[in-house]
Amino acid sequence: MRPFSRWWVWALLGVALLLVPWPAAVADAVYLGAVLPAWSVVTAALVSAVPLSLSAGLLLFGLAALVAALLWPGGAARAGQALGWALAVLLLTFPLAFGLGYRTTPIAPVGEAAAPAAYAAAREAVLTRLLVTAGPGRAALAAGAPDAAVLSGCVADVAARLRDAPSPTLPTRVKALPPGALLTFGFSGVVSPWLLEPHLDPGLPPAAATAVALHELAHTAGFARESEAEAVALLAGLGCEDPAAAYAAALAAASRLARRLPAEERQAYVASWPEGAVEDLAAAAAAAASYRSGALAAAVERAYDAYLVSLGTEGGMADYDRSTDALVRLLDLALPAPSAGDGVARGRHAVGGGSQVAADEGGDVGVAPHEAPEQHLGVLAVARLQHRAGELAAGVGVEDPLGLEAAERVGV
């Protein structure tokens, strides 16, 4: 039998193509310049046309067919071959459908913090946006998360300004899985890499779910790296005219920026947030924690960390926090920089001038918006509720007050 008639040969070829450290210029030209714009036209139409998850439906259909084949007399051998070839096809197509996105030119310097003054300006600009949008945004979210088509348009707008490449077509639906289906494993959203189909866990409250939806839509726009997807999601929401999207993104961005502050300055910054903001974060963290299985989440996190490292993401899961640095560098795409005497935040609410601490020094508060709880819980990440942050702002004691460390691991 010839080697290329064996499924495992093709499967190994797919793995090899995925692990090759393709030059960014090649990934930009092939993936961003050709494959993604063409393939997304097909996937966006399919995903937008069907309210339920196509990816989940195909998976269930495949499992049913496999069981039927196994039960059929003499069908075990055929079932094994079919399963092998299905795996080979998935591995071969993954690099072109999504995997090359990890090799593209970064939208911001990787692993480099911006100037300290830039973080202070970002905190002020984001706080101003949070104060302005809290009232109308929370009122809108009381009726549910905003329409996915609106979020899709906001993400597409930012994506077009960030990259000099043909614009991909984004889906206008984000599929809801059964509550807890993702949060149990420590994640709040996921994108199907072959169909570019975004999903979220509806076990989260509306503000957090909106942040997750933005993050997953950013993945469908070709931002495979977690830090870039999160930064694009926050930029898209902050600049969005929809008040619910703007509030959800502002809350997530403020949470991430707060994490970089020393404890006292963090507390002062959080104290300047509008009424209800801290409660919204706490509600997201509580919802994520109510579903999370510590053992399962830890195992999935280790696996996903290894996956990210294998695709060239330095630090694996640590990439999530780099979104803060990218957000600060690119914030002018969404919000104008406040002038010296401008904005609600200056004077009355500004804290910490240029001070900040490294992401891993945030101590008692983990702020993570989406994906995982990790990311923004979709932004707010859900979970390492082992840190107690004492009393916050108005004197309300909350575990992991900024509500964040958890939950947002989004990803594939």
Predicted features, each with a name:
Residues G99-D164, A176:
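Membrane-interface segments at or immediately adjacent to transmembrane helices
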